[in-house]
């Protein structure tokens, strides 16, 4: 079924990604469905959006035909459960096409004296180290999340303002647009 759908494409052209999917147990990244999905994405050059922790991310990438070297995985929230900056850095170093999505990311921001969201120093350093590897998203997976959309985008605007303009533009738009062939 998936192969037929991919071959058919969409009115706007071919599919550019698969997902989203959730693995609530990291061990499921070794399962046959996850392995087949990731192999398909790897072979077809499709991006995959996965809500997984750092252990599952490592397994999903390592189990692909390219051993994660050509795999385009969008890591929702840059880790369910809040992987440390060091762990994110290690996975980014190992997998050159791993992308971190930043919605609802625990530990990304710290409140300043006025209560505004500002990037925590270690995250700011990581975003500056890998300016082409992060993107923002909305995570509107249930209707109620739309009630918070304005607040979410305002938070993005606030902490993106802590970055050099070219880096903020990459994270806020360019990286996602490039990933999906929109620019």
State what each model feature region is:
Residues 1-4, 118-121, 152-154:
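Well-ordered, non-membrane alpha-helical segments in soluble/globular domains
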Residues 1-36, 40, 44:
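Mid-domain alpha/beta scaffold segments of enzyme catalytic cores
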Residues 14-17, 69, 167:
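Short loop/turn motifs at secondary-structure junctions
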Residues 18, 41, 77, 100, ...:
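Divalent metal-coordination and catalytic microenvironments
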Residues 21-24, 103, 174:
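Conserved residues at the C-terminal ends of beta-strands
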Residues 23, 54, 142-144:
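Short glycine-enriched loops at secondary-structure junctions
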Residues 27-136:
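Catalytic pocket-lining loop regions of alpha/beta-barrel enzymes
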Residues 128, 132-135, 142-183:
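Mid-to-C-terminal alpha-helical segments outside catalytic/metal-binding sites
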């Amino acid at each position: 079924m998936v192969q037929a759908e991919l071959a058919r494409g969409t009115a706007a052209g071919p599919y550019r990604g698969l997902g989203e999917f959730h693995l609530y147990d990291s061990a499921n990244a070794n399962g046959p469905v996850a392995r087949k999905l990731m192999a398909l994405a790897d072979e077809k050059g499709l991006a995959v959006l996965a809500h997984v922790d750092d252990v599952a991310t490592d397994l999903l990438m390592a189990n692909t035909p390219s051993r994660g070297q050509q795999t385009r995985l969008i890591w929702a929230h840059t880790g369910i459960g809040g992987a440390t900056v060091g762990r994110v850095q290690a996975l980014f170093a190992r997998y050159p096409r791993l992308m971190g999505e930043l919605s609802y990311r625990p530990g990304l921001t710290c409140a300043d004296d006025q209560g505004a969201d500002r990037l925590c120093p270690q995250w700011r350093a990581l975003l500056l180290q890998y300016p082409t590897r992060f993107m923002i998203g909305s995570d509107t997976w249930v209707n109620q999340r739309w009630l918070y959309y304005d607040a979410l985008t305002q938070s993005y605007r606030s902490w993106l303002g802590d970055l050099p303009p070219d880096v903020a533009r990459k994270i806020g738009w360019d990286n996602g647009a490039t990933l999906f062939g929109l620019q």
